[in-house]
Amino acid sequence: MKQAIVTGAGGGLGFSICKSLSENNYSVAALDLNLNDSEKTSDKLNNTKPYAADVRDEESIISLYEKIDNTPDLIVNNAGIARFGKLFDQKLSDFQDVVQTNLIGSFIVATEGAKRMVKEDKKGSIINITSVHSVNPGPGVGAYPITKSGLYSLTKLMALEWGEYGIRVNAIAPGFIDSGMSKPFFENPKVRKSRGKAVPLQRLGSADDIANTVLFLASEEASYINANEIVVDGGVIHSVLMHLPRD
């Protein structure tokens, strides 16, 4: 079995990623800030162990890697937070929290894992979960788009520097996904209908849409895909002209 580490494993998207990997020849280290959250995922899955660590804390992540028996073949940086509100209303602490978790946390987890891959001569894969906000930032979400576009830039830099060791680094940018931190947003029937209709495929995405993309990028079939961001959004970021009047 291959070894995977998934951060943010306690959420809906994290659970689906862990589930997909655990059913496809991976032993999964399900990581969340609180052990109770990671246990909610691991208790429902085979081949999955729960771990608690703070992705923002380098020592916490080093300790995590020492607890996991095997060097990872795959790292999925899925942990992320948002502090909603317009920029004028954002506190500096809000901004810093999002940057620390989404960008710096991903840097710490990926770098510590990659060091171990290199030491063990393991040609692994790292997948960073970004967002369509990294392509077209939306208002009212504070530092979130900035961290996601920064994470894509970090993805490309990691891929360039670590490619010589056989480590591939890619990103996945989810669109309107009915899971995780977006799920409460889509519980409003009006929002759910309008957002679904805005997508060329006429539906919201599911957590499985992202989990399946993770599985593909981690596979041998994707062995020559590197330094890329796969946008999984049903085409919504390219749909602006669909919604403008033509006469």
Question: Which residues does each PLM region occupy?
Answer:
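Substrate-binding pocket helix/loop in short-chain dehydrogenase/reductase
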Residues: K86-L87, D94-V99, R195
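Short C-terminal tail/terminal secondary-structure segment
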Residues: N226-D247
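Residue(s) in the substrate-gating loop at a strand-loop-helix junction
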Residues: S131
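C-terminal helical subdomain
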Residues: A171, K190-E221, I225, V232-G234
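Active-site helix of classical SDR
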Residues: A110, T147, T155
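Conserved glycine-rich cofactor-binding loop
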Residues: G10-G11
